[in-house]
Swiss-Prot record:
Catalytic activity: D-glyceraldehyde 3-phosphate + pyruvate + H(+) = 1-deoxy-D-xylulose 5-phosphate + CO2
Binding site for thiamine diphosphate: H78, G119, H120, S121, G152, A153, N180, Y289, E371
Official protein name in the record: 1-deoxy-D-xylulose-5-phosphate synthase
Molecular-function GO terms, alphabetical: 1-deoxy-D-xylulose-5-phosphate synthase activity; magnesium ion binding; thiamine pyrophosphate binding
Pfam families for the chain: DXP_synthase_N (PF13292), Transket_pyr (PF02779), Transketolase_C (PF02780)
Annotated SMART domains: Transket_pyr (SM00861)
Length: 640
């Protein structure tokens, strides 16, 4: 099917081209931009709903503000595809989230129009405030700094910390609150739009400031009463009292899809001489594309799809996804133990806890985008004898590391961490890769750190975690499907700190921590075919390490290779430290560790990226051959 014509958009290379258009053309431009966004994401997949919800806002911001001199900071970044199209990247928009292509988020190295990188939520106001203060210190001519943040991201404490600081500094910062769930705003309409225009006008604010200066000369009781009266009157009509208390001048709510409402308000706040202002904009995810508007998740994250029908093109599943295996196992354990509760930070579907919530609604807690709170909330429940499972992506657990140490680990509280999206995640790239959890958890005293080699082992670890009450315990698992194992009704209890041997050999030992085991087994077959007797061991635990097993592997083999899908400093580092302490590196043992390189891994196909860094069967065999001084030309035979 041919693409829809976009004659206005075809004239836009950069925002200065947009600003050359008359305002009367902007509605049509927004329609074309929405069409182009839908068509591009239908090819690549990605985050569609959020971007469709801010098309008019994106056009208005680049029209009113002098980007890139003025800075627009997008929180999270899911909504930035229209922004990328308008800022010189339309010719590459169909490479979104592909290896070597555009990032799915804002990225400083990608464009001058991306002043701050994103991926995790609730950072935009802090970054914007930092830029505002830096600009003032440099005595630059007045520059507008605009932070665009969603109402979901406003559930994180960091956003309020930044607003509190901005209010205290009286910094000249513009915050656009993109309320796309109607969780804050009352219904919008002509009266609301009129009031927003009225209170955003410089004359109104100037009068307000003069009254404030005059009132400071009056007695305190008069000042307090006047302030409360003004807040009541304006808050009653247009809301915003909370933001007023934080020191922000509040404007809104206004219809974020109506350019006649957006443009005058943005022009007014652009001219404010000082102080922080918050513009409350109401939008709708998936706006303008019927399949997205009708979908329960508003097409938040989609595969490639048919533009006409909206039907997503999904690959055939060969096995149950690890997330679903975790969900199944947790539900099974919860039927046996009414002390088990599930906790997630705004990711019930992504972590599989939505199914748990259907079965046990009173034992499921979604705390919003508040990972720090989630962990300490779990700690509090553990204090009272409950068994909390904090289901969280590896990348987001980083946000709560102090709570993991201070509130859980030091107190030896039995909080269970189900760490999803561990390892390389593919299209979401460096900001979402689960690279560091092994490293930052295994360094904590008496913290049990597990990783399953397949989906059956994951079920065993869920049961083991449920039964473990001596302190914190974690297990990590990747995005995507398992290997197709037949699943038992319920997992088995594992002995803490004990691995297992899958194959016995005599010359080469391959020990794997996690789901790279499928590649390890293929590599073992290839090594055996080359005449190298190979042992395969499943570590199961990075901490406590199975010292007896590791000692035996070191003493009985010429080559020992440790394999994990994580950063430097993880399982392999702990193994090497143990071997060094035991003096097992002094008698000719050739030890190699395969893990992520010392770099942030960008978006791309997991198969291709993991192959490039040597974490596939070919890389494992190459590592063994290199250790033995063998030629590696025959290795390509072992392609999976």
């Amino acid at each position: 099917m041919s693409r829809t014509l976009t004659p206005l958009l075809d004239r836009i290379c950069l925002p200065q081209d947009l600003r050359a258009l008359p305002e009367s053309d902007l509605v049509r431009l927004a329609d074309e931009l929405r069409t182009e966004t839908i068509d591009a994401v239908s090819v690549t997949g990605g985050h569609l709903g959020a971007g469709l919800g801010v098309v008019e806002l994106t056009v208005a911001l680049h029209y009113v503000f002098n980007t890139p001199e003025d800075r627009i900071i997008w929180d999270v970044g899911h909504q930035t595809y229209p922004h990328k199209i308008l800022t010189g990247r339309r010719d590459r928009i169909r490479t979104l989230r592909q290896e070597g292509g555009l990032s799915g988020f804002t990225k400083r190295s990608e464009s001058v129009y991306d002043p701050f990188g994103a991926g995790h939520s609730s950072t935009s106001i802090s970054a914007g405030l930092g830029m505002t203060v830096a600009s003032a210190l440099k005595a630059e001519k007045r520059r507008n700094i605009i932070a665009v943040i969603g109402d979901g991201a406003m559930s994180a404490g960091m956003a309020y910390e930044a607003m509190n600081n901005a209010g205290a500094l009286d910094a000249r910062l513009i915050v656009i609150l993109n309320d796309n769930d109607m969780s804050i705003a009352p219904p919008t309409g002509a009266m609301s739009a009129h009031l927003a225009r009225l209170v955003s006008r410089p004359a109104y604010r100037s009068l307000r400031e003069r009254i404030k200066m005059f009132s400071k000369k009056m007695p305190k009781f008069f000042l307090d009463k006047a302030r409360r009266s003004e807040e009541f009157a304006r808050g009653f009509l247009v809301g915003g009292t909370l933001f007023d208390e934080l020191g922000f001048y509040y404007v809104g709510p206004i219809d974020g899809h109506n350019l006649k409402h957006l443009l005058p308000v943005l022009k007014n706040v652009r001219e404010y001489p000082n102080g922080p202002v918050l513009v409350h904009v109401v939008t709708h995810k998936g706006k303008g594309y019927a399949p997205a508007e009708a979908s329960s998740d508003k097409y938040h994250g989609v595969n490639s799809f048919d533009v006409v029908t909206g039907k997503q093109i999904k690959t055939q599943s060969n096995a149950l996804a690890y997330t679903k295996v975790f969900s199944k196992a947790l539900i099974e354990e919860a039927t046996h133990d009414n002390k088990i509760v599930g906790i997630t930070a705004a990711m019930p579907t992504g972590t599989g806890l939505d199914a748990f919530a259907e079965k046990f609604p009173e034992r499921m807690f979604d705390v919003g985008i508040a990972e720090q709170h989630a962990v300490t909330f779990a700690a509090g429940m553990a204090c009272e004898g409950y068994k909390p499972f904090v289901a969280i992506y590896s990348t987001f657990l980083q946000r709560a590391y102090d709570q993991v140490i201070h509130d859980v680990s030091i107190q030896k509280l039995p909080v269970r961490f189900a760490i999803d999206r561990a390892g390389f995640v593919g299209a979401d790239g460096a900001t979402h890769a689960g690279s560091f959890d092994i490293v930052f958890l295994a360094t904590l005293p008496e913290f049990v750190v597990m990783a399953p080699s397949d989906e059956v082992e994951l079920m065993h670890m869920v049961r083991t975690a449920a039964a473990y009450d001596q302190g914190p315990i974690s297990f990590r698992y990747p995005r995507g499907e398992g290997v197709g194992m037949d699943l038992p009704q319920r997992g088995e209890l594992l002995e803490i700190g004990k691995g297992r041997v899958l194959r016995e050999g005599s010359r080469v030992a391959l020990v794997c921590f996690g789901t790279r085991m499928s590649e390890v087994l293929v590599a073992a077959d290839a090594l055996i075919a080359e005449g190298l007797s190979t042992t395969v061991a499943d570590a199961r635990f990075a901490k406590p390490l199975d010292k007896d097993l590791m000692r035996r592997l070191a003493c009985e083999h010429e080559v020992l290779v440790a394999v994990e899908e994580g950063a430097i400093g993880g399982f392999g580092a702990h193994l090497l430290q143990f071997l060094a302490k035991e003096g097992l590196l002094e008698h000719g043992l050739k030890v190699r560790t395969l893990k992520f390189p010392d770099e942030y891994l960008n978006h791309g196909s997991p198969e291709k990226v993991l192959s490039r860094i040597g974490l596939d069967a070919v890389g494992i065999v190459n590592t063994v051959f290199t250790a033995l001084g063998r030629e590696i030309r025959t290795v390509q035979k072992v392609r999976v």
